[in-house]
Amino acid sequence: MRQRDLKFTFVVGEGKLAFDVVEFELEEALCEPFRLNLKLASDKNAIDFRQVLDQPGTFTLWQDGRPARYVHGIVSHFTQGSSGFRRTRYELLLEPQLARLELCCNWRIFQEKSVPEILQALLKEHRVLDYEQRIYHEHLPREYCVQAGDSDHYLHDRLAFEEGLVYYFRFDEHRHTLVCSDRLYVQERIAGGPVLFSAQPEGDNPQPVLHSFRYSENVRTARQTQRDYSFKRPTYDQEHHLAGEALEHQGSSYERYDYPGRYKRSGAGRPFSESRLRGHRRDARVASVSGDDPRLIPGHAFALEGHPRADFNAWWRPVRVVHRGTQYAGQEEESADAPLGVSYDLRAELVPEDVEWRPAPLPRPRIDGPQIATVVGPAGEEIHCDEWGRVKVQFPWDREGRHDEFSTCWIRVAQNWAGADWGHMAIPRIGQEVIVDYLDGDCDQPIVTGRTYRATNRPPYALPDHKILSTIKSKEYKGSRANELRIDDTTAQISAALMSDHGASALHLGYLTHPRPEGGKPRGEGFELRTDEHGAVRAAKGLLLSTEEQLRAGAGHLDRGVVVQVLEAALKLARELGDYAGEHQGVGHDAAPQQTLQEAVRDLGHGANDESGKSNGGKPAIALSGPAGIAAATPASLTLAAGEHVDSVARQNQQVTAGQKVVINAGSDIGLFAQGGELRQITHQGPMLLQAQKNDIRLEAEQSVEVSASQQHVLVTAKEHITLMCGGAYLTLKGGNIELGMPGNFVVKAAKHSHVGPAHASTSFNAWDSTPFDDRYVLRDEATLEPLPNIAVEVIRGDGGVVKLMTDSQGRLPKQQHLAMDPVQIRILGKGSHNSDTESNT
C-alpha cells in the first residue's frame, strides 16, 4: 500500500553521509543476524568506499514525522550502480556486528567454562560490546569445548541452541544491542498498544494493521528421549524423557531418541533434552501474517485485536519478520510523471507468547579422523596423569595452548586391556606423540588411541638395521635407566629377554647373545637368570631343579622320575647297611626322616593339573637332579644344615677330603661301621689322640691287637691299676706296688739286675724332653700381685711324688710335666708375704 505519512532514511557513520532510500528489504528473525538490503540514490557519483564499507549505518522508518523504527548495523556490502542525469544508484547490505563472526573460523579449546561465559568471551573478542545476557537458570561449566574449524558464528549459535539460549536485537539510533536469554516468555513487548487486525483491502486502512492472518498447527515430535555415557558412572544411562506441550490436537507417541545427548552430567541432561524438543516443535503452532505495522520485531510480543475469531485476539510473538518498502521519491530523476509516495508492508511468522520457542538444533561438528598431539604437563615433570590414567595434550592446531598442564582437559587413554583392578597400563609420557580420535566424531570427546614415533622420539633401536627386534622398553622416571621385554626373531638365533638396568638383572631365553646393537656376539644357548644384586627362587609347594632331558616339554613340568628312583635306591641301601650295622653292635640307623623326604619328592606334583588324580602333595621340598652329577663349589665356606637329619648315601664310594681339618662332632653317638672292608685312622704328621673323657675305651678284635711305636715309646698309665693277663698269668700295678701271678714258671733274663730305692713316675716325667701336659707356676704376693723371688716351696704331685723347689728372681718355678692331666699341690716353705697354703689343679 501507499502511505504518504511514511518516510525512509539512511545515514552512514555519524550522519555525515546520507542517502535517499529507494527500496529496502529487512529480514530479521529470532536467533539469526538480521539482513537489511538497501537500494539507495545519491547526487554524489564518486563516494569513497572507505566512508561506507565496514562502517556503522542507521536506517530509520519515519511515521507521522516521528521515528517509528530504527535499524542500526554495520555495512557489509556496498555497490555503486548506474548514474542518471542527476543521481547515482547504490546498493548496500547492513548487518549486525554478530554477522562478522561468520568471517572468522578457529581451532581452539574452552575449558571449565559455561556456555554463557564462552559466548561472552567470543563476543568480546569481536568487540561486540553492546551485549546483554539475561540468564535465569543454572548453566553448568563444560569441562572441554572445542571449536573445530567452524566459524565463530556457527560456534556461537551451536552452543547457544544446545544450551537453550535465544537471542534477538534491540535497536536505537546509535546502536544495536544483542540480547541473549534462556527464557523467552519474560522478554520485551512492543510499545504503542495492541496491533490491529483488519480484513479490509490494502490501502483502505487509515492506520497500520495486519490485514492477513493464517494460523496453522503441525504434527511434530511429541517426546524427546536422550542418553549419554560417562565413564565415571558407567552403569547409569543418563536417560532423560520429556513430553511436549499442547499435544491436545495430535498423538503423543511420536518419540525422537537421540544418542549421544552431548552432556556428561545428568544435571545438564534435562535442559539439553528440553531445548532439543522445543526446537523440533518450533512450528507446531504458528501464524503467518502480513500487514504494515512496523512495530513487529522478532522476540517482542504484542497483543492482537480485531480478529473475528476471539481466541486469535491474544498475545503473539514474532519469530521471523520480512519488511519491504519502496520510496518513489528517492528514485525520481527529472521525469515529471515519476511515481510519488511510499510503499511499506511486512510478512511475519508468529507463535503464541507463552511458547518457549527454540530454534532447530544445529548439526554438531564432526572430526573427519584421528589427529596428532603431544603429551604435556608441568615443567620438570615426566609423567602427568590423574586417577583414571588420563593425560593432557597439546594439539598442533592449538595456538593458545602453552604446552603445559593447562593445554587441554584430562583426556582418556585407550589401553590394550582394562579390567576391574586388572589390565594393561602404560601412561603416555610428557613429550610423546599420541594419536587422538574422537568418540562419535565429537570434537568435545577426544580419546588417545595410539602413539607414534617422530624425530624427537626415536624408536629404541635403529631401524631398519634391527627390524627383527620387537620390544617393550620403558624409561626410568627422572632417570636414564630402563626396563625391557625384548624379542629377537633373528633366523636360527631367536631369543627373548626380560631385563632391568637395576643391578643388570635379566632373564635371557633361547639363543643368547650380547646386545645386537653392539655386535650380538654369541654367549650361550638355553636360559640365563642373572643379576649384579641379590637373587631368590621361591616355591611354596615344592621346587624341582633338574638337568634331566625333557625335549619340547613333552612331559609334566615336575617330571622327576630319575630323582625319585635314585632317592628310593639310596633309602634302600641306607636301610640295609644301617640295619646290618645295628645287628653287629654298630650305632642304630634311623631312616624315617629320609623316607619322609623321599616321599615328599615323590609326591611333589600331586594335585597339579597333570597329577590331579593323586593325593595332594605340595610339601615345600627342594629336589635337585643331575643325571651327570651335581657339583657344589665355593672358594669360601659351604654350610649344610638340617633341623632333623642329614642323610648322605652313595651306592659306591663316599669320600671326604679337607686340605686342613676334618672335624666331626656329635651330641650323642658316632658310629663307624665297615661291613666288608677295612677301617683305617692314620695321622701322617701329627699325633693321634683317642680319648674317652667320661667313660671307658674298649679295643676288641676277633684276632689280634697290636700296639707299636716304631721310633719312641709306648706308655700306658692308669690311676688305680694296670693289669695284663694271658693264659692264667697276670701282672698288676696298683698303689705303687707290682704283683705278678702265674700258674707256670717265672723266667727273668737280663744282663744285669739293679735294686734301688723308691721312685714316682710323675717326678721322672720332668726329665723328659716333652710331654703333652706341662705347666709353669709363678708365685705372687696376694695383695700386690708382685712376683716373689727366692722362695722355697714343696710341690706334691698326684701320685704322691714330692719335689722341693725354689722360685727364681721372677718368682717362677721349674716346669712340671706329665702325660695326662695331674693334680698339683704347692706348699710354701720359706719366708714370704703369706704362709697360707696354695693349691692348683691342672
Swiss-Prot record:
Disulfide bonds: none annotated. Pfam families: DUF2345, Phage_base_V, Phage_GPD, T6SS_Vgr. GO terms for biological process: protein secretion by the type VI secretion system. Disruption phenotype: Deletion leads to a 75% loss of internalization of P.aeruginosa into host cell. InterPro entries: Gp5/Vgr_OB, T6SS_Rhs_Vgr_dom, T6SS_RhsGE_Vgr_subset, T6SS_Vgr_RhsGE, T6SS_VgrG/RHS, Vgr_OB-fold_dom_sf, VgrG2_DUF2345. GO terms for cellular component: type VI protein secretion system complex. Residues 265-291 are annotated as: Disordered. It comes from the Bacteria. Part of the H2 type VI secretion system (H2-T6SS) specialized secretion system, which delivers several virulence factors in both prokaryotic and eukaryotic cells during infection. May form the spike at the tip of the elongating tube formed by haemolysin co-regulated protein 2a/Hcp2a. In turn, may allow the delivery of the Tle4 antibacterial toxin to target cells where it exerts its toxicity. Also promotes the release of VgrG2b toxin to the host cell. Belongs to the VgrG protein family. This is Type VI secretion system spike protein VgrG2a.
